Amino acid sequence: MATVAVALSGGVDSSTTALLMKEAGHRVFTLTMATNDRVAAEAARVSAFLGLPHHVLDISGLFEQRVIGPFCAAYLEGRTPNPCIACNRDLKYGTLFRQAVEWGADYFATGHYARVRFEPEPGRYVLLRARDPRKDQSYVLFYLDQERLARLLLPLGDLTKETVREKARAAGIPFTAAESQEICFVAGDDYRTFIRRRCGQAVAEGPFVDRQGNVLGRHRGIPFYTIGQRRGLGLALGRPVFVLGFNRERNAVIVGPEEELWHTAFLAVDVHYILPQPAGGTLIEAQIRYRAKAAPARLYPQPPDAARVVFEKPQRAITPGQAAVFYQGERVVGGGIISCAVR
């Protein structure tokens, strides 16, 4: 019997994870990263129902420093971040994981839909996609290292969402019914309103321009646009145009025809490998957005922590700031943050 710490939010996934760990006969305690009283109360209610010791870590300061601050800064710089990447790397599998181990946990369990297994060849733990491709969350976990993977339990990785809900309901768990929103700290996932309230003074109107620098109109501020956007531009040009990029020096949003959104390659930075670093030209599948389909590509590592990825076919709207995760079959090779697209 092992001691297992469960990261508990009070939602159906983490609540069912706690249930499964208890049913497996482990000594279980729960940990909650609290950014507000509501989250702490919901998690405490579930933990009490299951009869498990519960601990709350107030990470509001760290959350501001490691997640919200960089999120805002990225948008101000014309990048489109995925805050879940930083939250999982630095907080859930950083601060929370370390606290769990310090308090005696042999293993750390979460409600993520992914799988972990040890493979004798290459002699390490590997991260795999979930059995249910509709719920797979391996994309946001590519920064996990061997220390964490060796202690990680992901009991939902072999289950469907429907099965998880059925288990929770059958047990009578008082879980939070609502599905998690895409950005947990942004009401209604309306990031534009959030940015305007948080850093409106740093947002300035500027010109829409084409590739030649011709002014086509005025925009409301670089953070309110993302690569590939067509709607909401307010341009009446007699032809459809899309956001292609940004010119920070001119505070300009570059727009143009859709065909200019397609690129065959990109550069990634802050690259981390779970499998051994591949040789240059290794065939992989690269996933450039959370719900995008991974596409065949060649991976060219550029030590110490960058990589160039070349697709077999051009991809639409490769977006700086988004994570790019590299797969071979169902195994996660590694991943990084898109720096720029390359034709």
UniProtKB/Swiss-Prot annotation:
Sequence segments annotated as region (Interaction with tRNA): 135-137, 289-290
Binding-site positions, ATP: 7-14, 33, 111
GO biological process: tRNA wobble position uridine thiolation
Any one GO CC term of the record: cytoplasm
InterPro entries from the UniProt entry: MnmA-like, MnmA-like_C, MnmA-like_central, MnmA-like_central_sf, Rossmann-like_a/b/a_fold
Pfam family, one: tRNA_Me_trans_C
Residues flagged as site, Interaction with tRNA: 112, 322
Catalytically driven reaction(s): S-sulfanyl-L-cysteinyl-[protein] + uridine(34) in tRNA + AH2 + ATP = 2-thiouridine(34) in tRNA + L-cysteinyl-[protein] + A + AMP + diphosphate + H(+)
Disulfide bonds listed in the record: 87-184
Active site: 87, 184
Enzyme Commission code: 2.8.1.13
Localization annotation: Cytoplasm
The keyword ATP-binding belongs to this UniProt entry's keyword annotation: yes
Keywords: ATP-binding, Cytoplasm, Disulfide bond, Nucleotide-binding, RNA-binding, Transferase, tRNA processing, tRNA-binding
A single GO molecular function term of this UniProt record: tRNA-uridine 2-sulfurtransferase activity
HAMAP family cross-referenced by the UniProt entry: tRNA_thiouridyl_MnmA
Function: Catalyzes the 2-thiolation of uridine at the wobble position (U34) of tRNA, leading to the formation of s(2)U34.
Family: Belongs to the MnmA/TRMU family.
Name of the protein this chain belongs to: tRNA-specific 2-thiouridylase MnmA
Protein source organism: Desulforudis audaxviator (strain MP104C)
Taxonomic lineage: Bacteria, Bacillati, Bacillota, Clostridia, Thermoanaerobacterales
Encoding gene (name): mnmA
